[in-house]
Amino acid sequence: ASGQPEDVAQTVEQHYWPLSASGKLPETIQSAVISLSDKIDTICADFAIGLEPSGSADPYGLRRMTIGIIRMITDFIPNANVERIIDESLKNMPEKIKQLETFKNSKERIIKFLWNRIENIYENDGYKFDEVKSVILPAQKNGFNGIGDIKIKLSFLQQARKQASFEQIITIFKRANNIIQQAKKQNLQISETVTADLLKEEAELKLYEQHLTVTKQLNELLADKNYAQALNKLNDIKPHLDNFFENVMVMCDDDKIKLNRISLIAGIIKGFDSFVDLSVLQ
């Protein structure tokens, strides 16, 4: 970058950073954006021509490169549209590469590779396997949106698990999820819309009221990325779920009432599933 303005020269130099898994990150957003795009483009090109990592072999350092990508997204560009970068990279490949057999399904292979690397990165950082899975599964449903928040969600989840009540919370949510899975096996048409007029028992009425309150609060907290307080909402809903399961027969004979109760449970699970999947926690 000789003869270029200082900021241009700095961007050119730093777009190669980080040079190693733990190397120094770019110092400016411009350098980070170019570095991120360049690294994703490199991964796309290698996959497109069949040079993806296999077993322990990674001659082009793509696994290490992914660590740099995740670090930059976390520190600089939390809302980076990774899937769009992948799409643009593959779209602009030379036609002769697009004709290769290895180009087929390259996007799916790249996405699978990146998610596997993200899981490995956070497990190597000391988070438990089920914690990582719990946070990554909801993120996967949203493409790559929000992967910059995975680390902070994991940190809050790790702290929440230290609470004495958290194991009981996991148990009650697993029970709720099992009912949903049982209903799906019976091909019941589950929605998250509850018909209030069909709620008869005091316990289900109280659960529904709390569900409405917590859902509104959750939406506000998640919009503000206040994940610690969002997790605390589990404590607000738990006693009402306990009371519901103790006093209400969910799988009753009346199909309308049964489906309505299942829908109530499904709505509660969906609210928390948007950022943490409690069903995979051990």
PLM segments and residue spans:
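Amphipathic alpha-helical "coupling" segments that flank catalytic cores
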Residues: 1-282
